[in-house]
A protein has these predicted regions:
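Glycine-rich beta-strand-centered segment in the early N-terminal region that forms part
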Residues: 1-43, 48-54, 61-64
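Helix-to-beta-strand junctions that scaffold the AdoMet/dcAdoMet cofactor pocket
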Residues: 207-208
Length: 208
């Protein structure tokens, strides 16, 4: 069982600028921005490392060069295609750092919905109104969900989700009764994008 000893350095969804490259690196260069550099360097004394991308300095890999040279990495075993699927990628010119940071989260949103079995005709209930809930809402619609309902408690965020994801219904749980508004409705999938045991119990009532 993995345990975390505090204080620890977090960070696995970050952005970094390459300062130095090794002699066998061919497809990355100093000055390139990359997503998700890995915190594989020794942290400051007194700290442990949990992903550690916020360590100030981190590492990335020239995966294409490694594959061409026959170099293996334990990380590759988790990927169908190391070159296409490796999370640390060069950021295109013109893409902002905040947008680049969201790329890994968006991939996880899409993967989660696929794993949950969301498909054309699904009914999806999402609790949360932050960036993750927005991504889930967009991808649920993209996958063909016939009903996407979002429950949150920030009117401006819910309005943004309604505008961008074209969801069927948004509810503010602070001012509206979720049970009353959704009475009699059932959903194939319920996703807690806020992180609350109470939400899990509440959402389970609406599952088919």
């Amino acid at each position: 069982q993995n345990t975390i000893t505090y204080p620890t350095l977090l960070g696995h969804e970050g952005v970094g600028v390459i300062e130095q490259v090794g002699e066998k690196v061919r497809y990355l260069k100093p000055g390139d921005r990359v997503t998700s550099p890995l915190g594989m360097l020794t942290p400051a004394p007194g700290y442990t490392q949990t992903f550690g991308g916020m360590n100030g300095y981190a590492l990335t890999m020239d995966v294409k060069a490694m594959v061409e040279d026959g170099v293996k990495s334990p990380l590759f075993g988790m990927l169908d295609d190391p070159i296409l699927d490796f999370p640390s990628r060069r950021i295109p010119d013109g893409m902002s750092d905040p947008d680049a940071v969201m790329l890994l989260t968006m991939k996880e949103n899409y993967s989660a919905l696929k794993n949950f079995g969301v498909h054309a005709g699904s009914r999806v209930l999402i609790f949360g109104d932050g960036a993750v809930a927005l991504g889930l809402s967009c991808f649920a619609r993209y996958l063909g969900a016939v009903n996407v309902t979002v429950v949150g408690h920030h009117d401006e965020r819910l309005a943004r989700i309604a505008e961008l994801a074209k969801v069927d219904l948004t509810l503010n749980s602070k001012t509206e009764s979720v049970e009353e508004k959704l009475a009699g409705q059932k959903f194939d999938v319920c996703v807690d994008a806020a992180g609350s045991p109470e939400i899990v119990l509440q959402g389970a009532k609406f599952l088919v």
